[in-house]
Amino acid sequence: MWTRRAFKVALAGAVADVTLSARAAAVDAAVRPPARAGIEGQRRADLGDGRYLNPIVPGDHADPTILKDGADYYMTFSSFQACPGAVIWHSRDLVNWTPIGAALTRPIGTVWAMDLVKHAGRWFLYIPVLRDEGTGILVVHADDIRGPWSEPVDLRIPGCIDPGHVLGEDGRRYLFVNGGRRVRLADDGLATDGPVEQGAWTPWKYPADWVVEMFAPEGPKLLRRGEWFYLLSAVGGTAGPPTSHMVTLARSRSVHGPWEHCPHNPIVRTRSADEPWWSRGHASVVEGPAGDWWMVYHGYENGFRTLGRQALLEPVEWTADGWLRALGGTLDRPLAKPRGGQASPASRPLSDDFAHGPLGLQWSLHAAGADDAGRVRFEDGALVLKGKGRSLADCSPLACVVGDRRYEVTVELEIRGEGHGGLALFYDERGHAGIGFSTTQMLTYGYGQEHTWMREAMATRHVHIHLVNRDNVLTWRHSHDGGTTWTQHPWQMEVSGLHHNVFGGFTSLRVALFSAGAGEVRARNFTYKGLPA
């Protein structure tokens, strides 16, 4: 049954489709060069000719924090309600990235923009979280970047997010946080050494007539170069209008200030909705393999907010007067790769036969509870997902991030018990679309609810489901004879409105397997394929 909220969501998607797909088509025709297909047809940044085309990590990889350690680069991103979370990625050329492990293996809350640090031979990950009691910052540490990582330690600084670690000229460690604040750390980095200080830095303010989401000073990231400390931060809001987010720069000869703003602020900003990347911001700067300099940040792809904020790489240079200048323009075309890097495979296959464990790094449970790890096991050559909740909305589905504008997915499912399960595109509890099966019927989810009027009697335990997503239009098929013959679902869903500007949450529309009710679903042969634009 349609509700007022469901109608509004549907209308939002329809309006978005008319306006955004037109802009996206214009951008495709005008500036988007063809991407290079990588593993499984996924788009790949490395074009194979000495150039790359953004994004470097496609799909929902927001708030990048990056660290150079010799010839190696490591990066991680906000993981929100995903568990496992805080997946660490590795590269040797800044363009080709591979996931190597997860720093968080149990749910701790909603994980936002982190800071990855190496100090005195030990790795630290400072983690802002949102929990029932509010926001705060935790820290985990490890002697090896690949783990194991420690249990989280609460720094007990409520209301703080977006940590940026720096070692001051006084030899003390500090975390700069949102809102122009900072706190001194103990020498071991596992506790604070004093109160949160107000007014440690003053965010740069844009002109009043600029079209942004809100002021929202956040994401301080610091580095020391020569006699200067540099502080990058974001203002303008991370979503909202395409021209919202931006990168600003300040510097000081002391970690204690005073800080002076770059006369060329903002050094990165989306200035028009016609650009290929919207709301660019939340940057970190890193030295390249050959000594040149690069900036990583996130942005929404024009017309595809459903993919989330994707990781982007832009060359920068130091000016004669000691400021940073961005060199990539609107990122509308291929750029020369960093010099001197070692080519490495960019591989994150999403396909999974589920023949045995452990669970691949592409998978995570959404909004998992403390006991949800026990819902997933491997048995008889299948992944077994125990039912939870009553529907797709409240069952904590098993999801993976996708980064292609067009793709197809196929999975084989066996339904056991009194529940139901299936395949979905899942944003959150309020925004999702999918089809599911019990042993007696097929169920349809759209615009965040099950449409009972579309229930269809269907006695089966084994089903193959096939999903095609072409530019946010979904087509479903199902087969009950092992994939020999297929039946197309009567509803082709348009989902361009299932994103942060409608629902909040900052995440993306992910492919998900779900199991609801008093039963379990056995999954085999999950296959993913990116489709050409």
Model-derived segments and their meaning:
Residues M1-W2, A6-L20, A25-A533:
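Carbohydrate-active catalytic/glycan-binding domains of CAZyme proteins
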